[in-house]
Amino acid sequence: MREAICIHIGQAGCQVGNACWELFCLEHGIQPDGAMPSDKTIGVEDDAFNTFFSETGAGKHVPRAVFLDLEPTVVDEIRTGTYRQLFHPEQLISGKEDAANNYARGHYTIGKEIVDLCLDRIRKLADNCTGLQGFLVYHAVGGGTGSGLGALLLERLSVDYGKKSKLGYTVYPSPQVSTAVVEPYNSVLSTHSLLEHTDVAAMLDNEAIYDLTRANLDIERPTYTNLNRLIGQVVSALTASLRFDGALNVDLTEFQTNLVPYPRIHFVLTTYAPVISAEKAYHEQLSVSEISNAVFEPASMMTKCDPRHGKYMACCLMYRGDVVPKDVNAAVATIKTKRTIQFVDWSPTGFKCGINYQPPTVVPGGDLAKVQRAVCMIANSTAIAEVFARIDHKFDLMYSKRAFVHWYVGEGMEEGEFSEAREDLAALEKDYEEVGAESADMEGEEDVEEY
């Protein structure tokens, strides 16, 4: 069995986690107390959903997930919420005092005390797996817990489970909308360790998802629940191939192989289509070619960056629902003819497609329409460097005056870490620049070589 363990860190991670598990339960017909009426084989672990749920002797299904936060409010909501019977109480870990938007608190002082407990719980989950394939880590890098404790945990996971792949769903700070003044510090420090310790990181940002819900779902003032449910659909689409059967199934490590040309260049853009309200869906066809074109629209990106400013290096299209390979091939052929979608010249094919026959599920009373087919795209594009450039610029403005730095130093960090992390990101921007640069200027010398 190819199990995956989900780790939800900090407020963002836990709240996105809530939306995801709500959706996973609906998709598999698992009730909030973990019972699954449709599952006839009690205790048999070969069903596809066992990648995400472990089954107890009593026939109860328990998510392979850990929720951790340094302050209790968010985790307490899960402990008292609708799904309180679903999770094992030991999987919900919370501390007493929060990281106060401070990376150093999450990483050094307060995170240090809780991280061993977390690893212990993760170890128990891992021991329950017959063939663990990797971890899905959900966190935000703007706050203190998601960035600090998230980075610490990833570092420790690299030590304990070196070969297992780690996929991150990471909420990055938005260009205009901000929840904390020190976001640029936290994100730069956290990205510094994400570069080393994650294999693929899907970048999300609230502002882009706000705009998406406002434009397509006619919600005037989207709440975090609206946003998280949309993120839930994306996560579900990416992991559908682990949990259901389909024509072209995709493994966790397969994402890595197809999306990451160089180890450091592993930050990917995600889009999902169709994001459409029930009123509109009534009048639309939403054919395979339509939704395939929609995921390449700059407006449907889940991160505020314009893919037309960069080049694609690789691209995965995960279809689900009523889709046949013939339609997919036709849609991809059409996309390739478009001039707006440019690939780097060293990546000629560039597309990986997955098809899964399970149609997308919607949360009852949610905003999304029930549709026959959907597609989720994950793309590695050089345009993502815009996101880093933006954060780095804000970091520089604050750091040039050493504003707020004493809060970090007071928690046991050294100023050198700031400049080290910043240099690492400068190198990353440079890497993206080089990858996207035309390799035409090299061709002159290479013609001489005989093969």
From Swiss-Prot:
Family as reported in the entry's similarity comment: Belongs to the tubulin family.
Function, in words: Tubulin is the major constituent of microtubules, a cylinder consisting of laterally associated linear protofilaments composed of alpha- and beta-tubulin heterodimers. Microtubules grow by the addition of GTP-tubulin dimers to the microtubule end, where a stabilizing cap forms. Below the cap, tubulin dimers are in GDP-bound state, owing to GTPase activity of alpha-tubulin.
Residue(s) carrying N6-acetyllysine: K40
PANTHER family per UniProt: TUBULIN (PTHR11588)
Catalytic residue positions: E254
InterPro entries: Alpha_tubulin, Tub_FtsZ_C, Tubulin, Tubulin/FtsZ-like_C, Tubulin/FtsZ_2-layer-sand-dom, Tubulin/FtsZ_GTPase_sf, Tubulin_C, Tubulin_CS
Keyword line: Acetylation, Cytoplasm, Cytoskeleton, GTP-binding, Hydrolase, Magnesium, Metal-binding, Microtubule, Nucleotide-binding
Residues at the site labelled Involved in polymerization: Y451
Subunit structure comment from the entry: Dimer of alpha and beta chains. A typical microtubule is a hollow water-filled tube with an outer diameter of 25 nm and an inner diameter of 15 nM. Alpha-beta heterodimers associate head-to-tail to form protofilaments running lengthwise along the microtubule wall with the beta-tubulin subunit facing the microtubule plus end conferring a structural polarity. Microtubules usually have 13 protofilaments but different protofilament numbers can be found in some organisms and specialized cells.
Residue sites binding Mg(2+) per the record: E71
One GO term of the biological process aspect: microtubule-based process
Source organism: Trypanosoma cruzi
Protein name in UniProt: Tubulin alpha chain
